[in-house]
Amino acid sequence: MFVSTNIMEEEPVVNAVNQIKDKFGGLHIAVNCAGTGYPGRILGKEAPHPLDAFQFIINLNLVGTFNVMRIAAELMDKNEPDEKGEKGVIINTASVAGYEGQIGQSAYSASKAGVIGLTLTAARDLARHAVRVCTIAPGIFDTPLMQLAPDKVRDPLLESTQFPHRFGQPSEFADLAVHIVENAYLNGETIRLDSGMRMKPR
């Protein structure tokens, strides 16, 4: 089932969640993956970083994540607890840039650091409702967008990986999400999925 929505606004997300409820009878798992970036230094060659661009990235990556999380949690709270006493699991997506933002990533890095900072608080807020919250902070993954990147972009990123010395596969992100759902003792954690890489300044 595919439902188009705008995570930055309340009504479209409520409508999307209600469609899920109508078809499946409820909601037990929510994985927040929507997001984007904006390359730009705080002081560019001709002008400061556009404020509206910074606000858009924060609104999409951080506020949008919070918006989906709160609306999903409201529906999860109506579930009957499962055999573990759990009503739902929310998995948010951050980035290693939330820890080591590169030059020109101020908006993206700030938005993902916000998601990381939100994780434990959200888990504590929702504990009384038997809803767990975890975050995955992926490194560099071999996505269609990355496959289009030139070698001068890909090679330095690949050099930052440790073992395995390669880009991550989307299936590995999915595997971790499934593990978080299945492991009822994981809560309030941000898990780096990056083969031990640490981002260089550029």
What is each PLM-predicted segment?
Residues 59, 152-172:
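Catalytic Tyr-x(3-8)-Lys segment
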Residues 95:
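Residue(s) in the substrate-gating loop at a strand-loop-helix junction
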Residues 127, 132, 186-189:
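Short, small/polar-rich loop/turn modules that mediate ligand/substrate recognition or access, typified
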Residues 74, 123-125:
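Alpha-helical segment proximal to the catalytic Tyr-Lys
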Residues 169-193, 198:
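C-terminal substrate-recognition "lid" of short-chain dehydrogenase/reductases
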Residues 36, 47-67, 91, 115:
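Catalytic Tyr-X3-Lys loop
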Residues 69, 111, 119:
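Active-site helix of classical SDR
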Residues 14, 37-55, 74, 78-84, ...:
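Conserved mid-core segment of classical short-chain dehydrogenase/reductases
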